[in-house]
Amino acid sequence: MFPQRLDSTIAYDIAKAMMDGFNRHYQLFRTESARAKHRFETADWHGQQRAQRERIEFYDLRVREASTRLEREFKAGEQSMDVWHQVKLHYIGLLVNHHQPELAETFFNSVTTKILHRSYFQNDFIFVRPAVSTEYIENEEPTAQPTYRAYYPTRDNLREIIVRLVRDFDLRLEFEDLERDAGYVLEAVSERLSDVKLRANFQIQVLSGLFFRNKGAYVVGKIINGFNEVPLALPILHSKSGKLVIDAALFGEDDLLILFSFARAYFMVDMGIPSAYVQFLRSMMPHMPRAEIYNALGLAKQGKTLFYRDFLHHLRHSTDKFRIAPGIKGMVMLVFDLPSFPYVFKVIKDYYPPQKDTSREQIKGKYLLVKQHDRVGRMADTQEYSEVAFPRARFDDELIAEIEKFAPSQLEISDRDRDGNTEVIIKHVYIERRMIPLNIYLQEAFDAGVGEPAAKNQIERAVVEYGNAIKDLVAANIFPGDMLWKNFGITRHGKVVFYDYDEIEYITDCKFRRVPAPRNDEEEMSGEVWYSVGPKDVFPETFAPFLLGNDAVREVFMKHHGDLLDAEFWQSHQARIQAGHVHDVFPYEREKRFTRRHSPGRNDHELLTHLPPEPMLTGLSGMTP
């Protein structure tokens, strides 16, 4: 029970010190995010990548600072239960007019759980559930920007509105031809509005902060007409001339889901009220969990908090059991899942076969590398948890036996909370989105018969995407290491994503070689490797026997990605990266780029200047998504 009186002389001071720690964290986070605009304007791509890596570390640093201060100044760990009750109440009071209350609650949890015994990990002492609403938070200061801006175009002035909308972001680098680009956007919009009657509420709403990632800036918003809303994003890039261009117009939830995918690096965006951004983005992408939206915005700890709450809610409202995940078992990771829940749980094994020359700390280092690196839409993001408790009754006995055999150091089965419920406690686990393993996806097509048109299309799509995934990883200076089909998965949008990280290396750390010609018949006929192989040596031509055993797969692979078997391909990209070049990787199909859709010599007067006349009757169908 909470105390009826706030009579502690120290509780408020502890709460205030904790709030000071959070405010310092978010100010630093926001400042670094805001600097992304200048880095974009000056084409400081290496600085942008460095800032993205470093910003990930901000949170843990501030949590350590705050917990150290509380112990030093208040001996926080020695305070009574009654004092800690009051600390939470005072903290809630400090959140009343706060602009980031949900983040501050999570920060409170992070600091408190570093100090207190786990018996305190309940809603009386920490925020198991949120205490302060994030609805309708507004910054009332006169100079504050609103979360989003609304524009009210007509059929005649939509092109001018697009120009004004972009100029309102005050980018300090000149556009190559903004009027031309606005005409391109207008043409793309007109494809969705040409047969639509504009209603009284026709408007474009755009979030006030630009979204920066890698070499791009993104205008994010939505078009509203009648009962319909269509998500919209405009990528802004540097052209070869060094000026700015609008590169494409993205429409609809699917385009936005790919842009905000869990397989991409986090955005940098200056947000005064992050919950308002999340609410706006959720209205555009209702199928994207709020946890993943917070992750995409760089607020990964909040994403972890919401994910865990969603997970506990799902456990309470489901009855199926955790099981060994389907597919080929890994040599390093033990993977299990809950069939009704769209994520997998990965535990590092205690023992590895001799060919896996690695350690637990090395594997953790690889996963941290992926977390901090540009994932270019091809490496799944993971959430890392410690001391996770599951109901024992929900675990399949075969799964328990598997963990006891391969990862006994990571397993505890006990009634730790002394509440009469036996739990399975996993010491350390990674959680990531479930995908269809690529080997299973291909096997389904083989089983259907490679002569079937649908199966043939599935094989071609999978193999082409697999090669594209590897080439995108190469562009980002990542060598997957183990390139077997089983280490890649298919997402809901048909994208191939890599998810086995224990052997990844930087391209620049590898030595790509051709297999030397045999010097005699004995070497040529030998079943063993007769040439010297260094620890970082890679022989691309040796990939073929492991990947291309199926004729249908080989045909597609050699047609589209045969260069992956040539050491020269890898060496050329290695040289490019070492020379400091940052490659372009687009979070949308290249066919959507205006440079693909419009010929370079096209005259400006050929572009639309306004929407076509509206039809007499349109019903309620609204816009084409």
Curated annotation (Swiss-Prot):
Membrane-crossing segments per the record: none
UniProt cross-references to InterPro entries, sorted A to Z: AceK_kinase, AceK_regulatory, Isocitrate_DH_AceK
Entry EC no(s): 2.7.11.5, 3.1.3.-
Gene Ontology annotations for the cellular component aspect, listed alphabetically: cytoplasm
Pfam families attached to this UniProt entry: AceK_kinase (PF06315), AceK_regulatory (PF20423)
Taxonomic superkingdom: Bacteria
Subcellular location(s) of the protein: Cytoplasm
Molecular function terms from GO: [isocitrate dehydrogenase (NADP+)] kinase activity; AMP binding; ATP binding; phosphoprotein phosphatase activity; protein serine/threonine kinase activity
Entry's Gene Ontology BP terms: glucose metabolic process; glyoxylate cycle; tricarboxylic acid cycle
Record keywords: ATP-binding, Cytoplasm, Glyoxylate bypass, Hydrolase, Kinase, Nucleotide-binding, Protein phosphatase, Serine/threonine-protein kinase, Transferase, Tricarboxylic acid cycle
Function, in words: Bifunctional enzyme which can phosphorylate or dephosphorylate isocitrate dehydrogenase (IDH) on a specific serine residue. This is a regulatory mechanism which enables bacteria to bypass the Krebs cycle via the glyoxylate shunt in response to the source of carbon. When bacteria are grown on glucose, IDH is fully active and unphosphorylated, but when grown on acetate or ethanol, the activity of IDH declines drastically concomitant with its phosphorylation.
Family, similarity comment: Belongs to the AceK family.
Name this polypeptide is given: Isocitrate dehydrogenase kinase/phosphatase
Source organism per UniProt: Polaromonas sp. (strain JS666 / ATCC BAA-500)
